[in-house]
Structure formats: C-alpha cells, structure tokens
Amino acid sequence: MAENRSQSRMHVVWNGAIRLPTLHIVQVKVLNLTDAGMQFSCSENLRIGQKYEMQIHVPDLNGGPNTTVVPCFAECLYVILSGREFRVGAKFSGLSPKNNELLLKWSERCARGVA
C-alpha cells in the first residue's frame, strides 16, 4: 500500500523525553520522522490535540558518540495502544532553524540509504 504523505518516513530508534501537563517527564522512543512530525512510543496515553514540550536525542551524523538534544513541541495527532505502550503520532513545532537543518540532513542521509 502506498503512503499518502508528502515526505516518506525516516525509520529511527532515538531516545527522547516528553513533559506531561503534570510536569512529570516521561521517556519516549522515537520510531520514525518526517519533515513535519514523528511517531514515538510512550508509556502514557497522551491527549489528542494537546501540545507537549519534548526533547529528542539525535545521534551524531558522522557516527560519533555525541548526541544533540533537540527541543521542540509535539502536537499529538493520534494515539494507538500497542502492547503495553502507546504509539503516538505528533506534529513538530518550535524547532530552531539549526535543529530543523539537522533533522533534514538525517532525512537526506536516510533517503540515500546511508543510515
């Protein structure tokens, strides 16, 4: 089945964290990204339409040991229960130009099959 999206998904396994409205921090696992958003797994059932403060730990493009912490906001678009976790689809906002460029470089790299 063909995907109906402007940008194909970039499959990743990156760590991240999300701040709940209660100010509790929950660890997440980013599963895939596009230029507009992402899917991640989370132990909490997030609220559709809610905007959450988030951080994504993006690996070094050259395979080095360092990661870049990318702060952003994620607006919850859907939540699907998958086993003991929830799969969450979210739209990005609040990315700095520098961090947006980093994610675009990763996307280009994955499109070339290098990742």
Language model segments and positions:
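Short, charged beta-turn/beta-strand-edge "cap" motif at the junction between a beta-strand
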Residues: 57-62
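Short, conserved beta-turn/loop elements at beta-strand boundaries and strand-helix junctions
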Residues: 35, 79-84
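Short beta-strand-centered aromatic/proline hotspots
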Residues: 27-30, 72-78
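C-terminal output/interaction extensions
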Residues: 83-115
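Short coil-to-beta-strand transition motifs
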Residues: 10-11, 22-25, 63-73
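N-terminal helix initiation/capping motif
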Residues: 1-33, 43, 104-115
